[in-house]
Curated annotation (Swiss-Prot):
An annotated GO BP: 7-methylguanosine mRNA capping
Physiological role: Catalytic subunit of the mRNA-capping methyltransferase RNMT:RAMAC complex that methylates the N7 position of the added guanosine to the 5'-cap structure of mRNAs. Binds RNA containing 5'-terminal GpppC.
Catalytic activity, as annotated: a 5'-end (5'-triphosphoguanosine)-ribonucleoside in mRNA + S-adenosyl-L-methionine = a 5'-end (N(7)-methyl 5'-triphosphoguanosine)-ribonucleoside in mRNA + S-adenosyl-L-homocysteine
Lineage of source species: Eukaryota, Metazoa, Chordata, Craniata, Vertebrata
Enzyme Commission number, as recorded: 2.1.1.56
InterPro entries xrefs: mRNA_G-N7_MeTrfase_dom, mRNA_G-N7_MeTrfase_euk, RG7MT1, SAM-dependent_MTases_sf
SUPFAM superfamilies: S-adenosyl-L-methionine-dependent methyltransferases
Main EC class the enzyme belongs to: transferase
Annotated site location: mRNA cap binding: 137, 143, 168, 217, 299, 396
Family (UniProt): Belongs to the class I-like SAM-binding methyltransferase superfamily. mRNA cap 0 methyltransferase family.
Coarse class of the protein's main subcellular location: nucleus
Stated name of the protein: mRNA cap guanine-N(7) methyltransferase
Length: 405
């Protein structure tokens, strides 16, 4: 599977190393979007009169959680319930899933992102400390082990997930035998409402990396929650430390919504449903997201320029923001990352091997691949995702902030 296809690129852009084809989904960059995100009905550049904009808080204002107004429970309990009730599934079960390759592809994206910044930190220190903010069941433990870090703090709002993460870590240590494994600490906490620095075993701990994968958007229910999560992510970073993560692209979500005839969009893999169109408040812009059998919870739109502005409060500077498509095209040129893509089974072989079926039964899901096969210019099998999976994964972006001295 030497040839890799992205349905969003042009058929004519084929070469002997990586083949990409044009797919039915037309990607539109954020600058093409004219849809307005608003604050109480106002454009971002024009905050409502006689109301204090949350982005203009003075640096000296009290930040202690005890001095903040009490927040309602919000949607956090729904998120906790959902993730606590997700069953543990083995590899055999996962491999039969409609989104087996999609999940592996997203996992590969995280691996490439984490690996990139672990190497950046390693240039200045070998004792790397990491905060995994929204660790879930510990899906990134092997990535941190591969990165050779020294210390990991895992935290999540779902207590069952944290316990499963800790069990995975213990199992990892048992199987490692004489091989050194990083120290780990596990915390159950709502990082949108609780100050993590009051909970660490070492009250003076500093981190080189904070990783927040597919989680930060839950905090955009209110300004206070988004700010608290950002504080937890950034306040204990060393100068030169990084806050990295993945999150849905607000511009892409709004673009697809506005192109839809209803308040929802998606396909047989994922669906997104908003309450209404037209106005998208900076905080509390809720939508319901479902992804096959994995996710079915309320989420909140993230207007990325607001996140960039808020991060300045914690001396954080955005060093890059890339769509999944942009990041994929960059990393797949690297032979090591390309091999990892294959090992992780992040792309589906096309055509399917004898006695095997493609994950999608719809022929239109593979039109992009079939066109290239018919051209006879590539070595088979090709590596790709179905059209439906490409559409699902292309709603995301990756980001990286650096702590300024």
């Amino acid at each position: 599977m030497d040839n890799i296809l992205n349905p969003e690129d042009n058929v004519s852009q084929t070469n002997t190393e990586t083949d990409v084809t044009d797919g039915p989904f037309q990607y539109v960059k954020e600058e093409h979007s004219s849809h307005k995100f608003t604050a109480s009905g106002q454009n971002l550049d024009s905050p409502p009169k006689n109301k204090k904009s949350p982005l203009k808080r003075k640096a000296g204002e009290p930040e202690s959680p005890s001095k903040r107004p009490r927040l309602e429970e919000g949607h956090g309990s729904l998120v906790v319930t959902h993730y606590n009730e997700l069953p543990e599934t083995g590899l055999e079960t996962r491999s039969q899933s409609r989104i087996f390759h999609l999940r592996n592809f997203n996992n590969w994206m995280k691996s490439a992102l984490i690996g990139e910044f672990v190497e950046k930190v390693r240039q200045r220190t070998r004792n790397i400390a990491v905060l995994d903010l929204g660790c879930g069941k510990g899906g990134d433990l092997l990535k941190w082990r591969k990165g050779g870090i020294s210390k990991l703090v895992c935290t999540d709002i779902a207590d069952v997930s944290v316990k499963q993460c800790e069990e995975r870590y213990k199992d990892l240590k048992r199987k490692s035998r004489n091989e050194r494994v990083f120290e780990a600490e596990f915390l159950t906490a709502d990082s949108t409402k609780e100050l993590l620095s009051e909970k660490y075993n070492d009250p003076e701990i500093k981190f080189d990396i904070c990783s927040c994968q597919f989680v930060y958007h839950y905090s955009f229910e209110t300004y206070e929650q988004a700010d608290m999560m950002l504080r937890n992510a950034c306040e204990r970073l060393c100068p030169g430390g990084f806050f990295i993560g993945t999150t849905p692209d607000g511009f892409e979500l709004v673009k697809r919504l506005e192109a839809s005839d209803t308040n929802s969009f998606g396909n047989d893999v994922y669906t997104v449903k908003f309450e209404k169109k037209g106005k998208y408040p900076l905080f509390g812009c809720k939508y319901d997201f479902s992804l096959e059998e994995v996710v079915n919870v309320p989420e909140f739109l993230v207007y990325f320029p607001v996140l960039v502005e808020m991060a300045k409060k914690y001396q954080m500077k955005l060093i890059y923001k890339k769509t999944f498509r942009e990041f994929f095209e960059e990393k797949v040129k690297n032979d090591e990352q390309k091999m990892l893509l294959k090992r992780m089974k992040a792309l589906e072989p096309y055509p399917a091997a004898p006695n095997f079926k493609l994950v999608s039964g719809r022929t239109e899901d593979y039109e992009h691949a079939q066109k290239l096969v018919e051209n006879g210019q590539v070595k088979l099998p090709l590596g790709t995702l179905s059209k439906s999976e490409w559409e699902a994964t292309s709603i995301y972006l990756l980001f990286a902030f650096e702590k300024q001295a």
